[in-house]
Amino acid sequence: PEQLIEQARALRHLILRHPPGHAQRTLAYFMALGHYDAQIRRLRRHLGGRRQVLQAALDQHQLFSHTASHFGGTSFWMKGPDWLDSRALADRAAEMGVLIEPGEVFFQSGAAQHNYFRLAYSSIGESQIAEGIGRLAAAVETLRP
């Protein structure tokens, strides 16, 4: 781990030496005036509503097991049945207007699990979530052996 940390620090140094001073000052004012905390509260309310709608839609369709942080976040980590290939599901769902992120890229090389995927909700309106999960369920059914 120490060697990795050293390499990461060296890379960071090449990518970003110092944020511009005016950007640092603007952010400092934004935070000092309480705007950052207010924005976090707004985001928590906004995303919390979407999260609840997504949770209800997933519960209704009972397709997959899933996990999501209880402290925020913008996506659910989904585990499909063993036969499910999340890459094929991503392609089929995209044809139906639903985007998911296959999970194998999140696993260490050689340990990829093809039935996992990430389902994000930060850019989808609450009114579209239930329909999207219905479409995702239909996409799964087309792949069922």
List each language-model region with its residue ranges.
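PLP-dependent class I/II
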Residues: P1-P145
